[in-house]
Amino acid sequence: MALRIALSGFVVLVVAMGIGRFAFTPQVPLMIAAGQLTLTSAGLVAAMNYLGYLVGAWDAMRAHRFVETRLWLGITGAVALTLLSAAADNAVVHGLLRFVIGCMSGWSMVLIAAWTNERLGQLGKPGLSAAVFAGPGAGIALSGLLAVYIQAKSLSAGAAWQIYGVLALVLIALVARYLPRSGQLHRPGSAPEPLVLTADLTRLVWS
């Protein structure tokens, strides 16, 4: 059970972070070649992605209602919008998509981490949470290897987005049955105590 939970969290972060958030980077040369972006607009689109991630992560951190809904929207949204990116043909549309995908990946990252940490702790296997957080790195590596194949086959940016999206869909389909349903992801109903910046904590921050 614990290994299944850790693997499910790992796959979610492969999809939401490694593909949904970071597949954009190896796509930039193809989108520039297709006239969809310039170097300047590519940087702005990437910034929209980071802004979206900040918004999504901040919202997930504060959420006490519809928590599982956010998680599922984050996961399915990352997959759907990666596929939809194949139809985008200009910086404005890509920027909007990247912002929303950023929000989706922020929700997924924070909430899947909360769920896996809680469940693994209950099962006495907290150390397996390290496997969950290997997901983004594995996803980035997978996206990079796919990019090599895509370049070798001289595929278009649109075709590449479809490949990334289909892969994300297949991966999520493999673990969807194990992910939390309504009422299974517990969040405290009250706000946490405010953080007091003690001398020890200050030294930890600066160390």
Predicted regions mapped to residue ranges:
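Small-residue-rich segments within alpha-helical transmembrane domains of MFS-like 12-TM solute carriers
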Residues: 18, 22, 102-110, 141
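Conserved MFS/SLC helix-loop-helix module at the cytosolic interface between two early adjacent transmembrane helices
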Residues: 54-89
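Cytoplasmic helix-loop-helix junction between adjacent transmembrane helices
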Residues: 99-135
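Juxtamembrane intracellular "pre-TM" segments in multi-pass secondary transporters
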Residues: 179-207
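Helix-loop-helix hairpin linking two adjacent transmembrane segments in secondary transporters
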Residues: 91, 130-180
